[in-house]
Regions:
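Short helix-capping segments at alpha-helix termini
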Residues: 37, 122-126, 156-158, 289-298
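Fold-level recognition of mixed alpha/beta catalytic cores in primary-metabolism enzymes, strongest
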Residues: 99, 104-105, 109-218, 237-239, ...
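Active-site metal-binding loops of divalent metal-dependent hydrolases
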Residues: 74, 170, 340
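Acidic/His- and Gly-rich active-site-bordering loop/insert found
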Residues: 1-102, 120-127, 361
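Short beta-strand micro-motifs in enzyme catalytic cores
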Residues: 52-56, 183-185, 261
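Metal-dependent amide/peptide-bond hydrolase catalytic core
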Residues: 186-395
Length: 395
């Protein structure tokens, strides 16, 4: 444990980097900590949902092949209005064996560990480049990684892009080589309005949406029943494609026939599946729906589907030098699958093999009173240094 580690964590947690807000101040702080250690730094501006965000790339070491990327996202999920908070979300608080604050688990705690490891790094021992990639807007679809992954070659210039990336998402120091894709889409039902006393003169969008949800729910049961044997151990909690109704909005008054209803849905497919196949099958099934509501009127509702976002799956090859190094420092003997999506999926699209391993506990991610265990937090910098030594310093 070092005072510097806790000082950095305190500063990082204090930045309000909810995805809907700019992360520039936090990224400037991180760059300011790395530059005195000899790191070259570059901020990549990205305009995301109308908010000025930046990705940060920092690199050190000779411009030789191989090396290592270590990555984490700076943004967090919201905390305003989230019930259950008993502590100030943007204040790092130590209580017993826990360290509280938004982002301590997901995943500013890991970034603080990276800065502590860099703070004591002997750069003269580097034989291959070390690259930190800290991203924006991971929590709303890995948008920062989608932008920075293809740009790394240009950003790094004469330094070759490392082909291995360590993503420090919360795994309780387990190792994951895979995760499912994440696809989100919207269904809009457009009915015909009117007075609720004459329901047959309109068509109720909410009533038709109930049929939409029943149709999608039936398909979900089919997906859940398909459990390929090769994924029973990788995703033991859900070795299948999974689907979730996220939000629904419709209607403005009890005495009005609802004209419009919108449903947002997300689903996750196994790594070897084509992510959009499920979406296209849902489109096909919804196109076959009648469009009448239960009142039996002449009008039919229109059912429209629109794709919102895609995060590709991750299924990294086994037996890499990074996997061996992570097994060594964590004591793990095998890797599995993560239940969430990560920036690693977009890095993989740029030819970078990614593994997931971090100090946080997934059960604490996005929760009120988010925290990380002190033992998991304190041991992180030494683990990061050992992996750097093995992949960037060893002959």
């Amino acid at each position: 444990m070092s005072d510097y580690l806790y000082d950095v964590a305190k500063r990082l947690v204090a930045f309000d980097t909810v995805s809907s807000k700019s992360d520039r101040d936090a990224m400037d702080y991180i760059a300011g900590e790395l530059a005195p250690r000899g790191f070259k730094t570059a901020l990549q501006p990205v305009e995301l949902s109308g908010v000025a965000q930046v990705n940060l790339v920092a690199w050190l070491g000779p411009p030789t092949a191989d090396g290592l990327i270590i990555s984490g996202h700076v943004d967090t999920v919201p905390f305003d209005g989230q019930p259950g908070w008993e502590r100030a979300p943007l204040t790092l608080e130590i209580a017993g064996e826990r360290i509280y604050g938004r982002g301590t688990t997901d995943m500013k705690g890991f970034i603080a560990q990276c800065l502590d490891a860099a703070h004591t790094l002997d750069s003269t021992r580097l034989k291959r480049p070390l690259v930190f990639v800290f991203t924006a807007s991971e929590e709303i679809g890995c948008l920062g990684a989608h932008s920075v992954g293809p740009a790394l070659k240009q950003i790094l210039g004469e330094t070759p892009v490392p082909r291995l990336a360590w993503i420090g998402e919360p795994t309780s120091w387990g190792v994951s080589h895979a995760h499912k894709s994440i696809v989100s889409f919207q269904v809009t039902v457009r009915g015909a309005g009117g007075h609720s006393g004459a329901p047959a003169k309109g068509v109720n969008a909410i009533a038709v949406m109930a049929r939409v949800m029943d149709t999608i729910g039936g398909y979900q049961q089919e997906l859940t029943a398909r459990r390929p044997a090769e994924y029973l151990e990788v995703f033991p909690d859900a070795p299948c494609d999974v689907l979730n109704f996220g939000t629904i909005h419709g209607g403005i008054a009890l005495n009005m026939i609802t004209e419009e209803c919108k449903l947002r849905v997300s689903y996750r497919t196994l790594p070897d599946a084509e992510p959009l196949d499920v979406f296209h099958e849902i489109e096909r099934r919804l196109a076959a729906l009648d469009g009448h509501d239960y009142a039996g009127g002449e009008h039919r509702a229109k059912i429209e589907t629109s794709l919102l976002n895609i995060v590709p799956p991750l299924n990294s090859p086994r037996g890499t030098a990074l996997e061996s190094a992570l097994f060594e420092v964590t004591g793990e003997k095998t890797s599995g699958g993560a239940l969430y999506g990560t920036d690693g999926s977009w890095f993989t699209r740029s030819g970078i093999t990614s593994l997931i391993c971090g100090p946080g506990d997934l059960e604490q991610a996005h929760q009120p009173n988010e925290h990380v265990r002190r033992d998991a937090f304190d041991r992180g910098p030494a683990m990061i240094r050992k992996v750097i030594e093995r992949l960037c310093c060893a002959a």
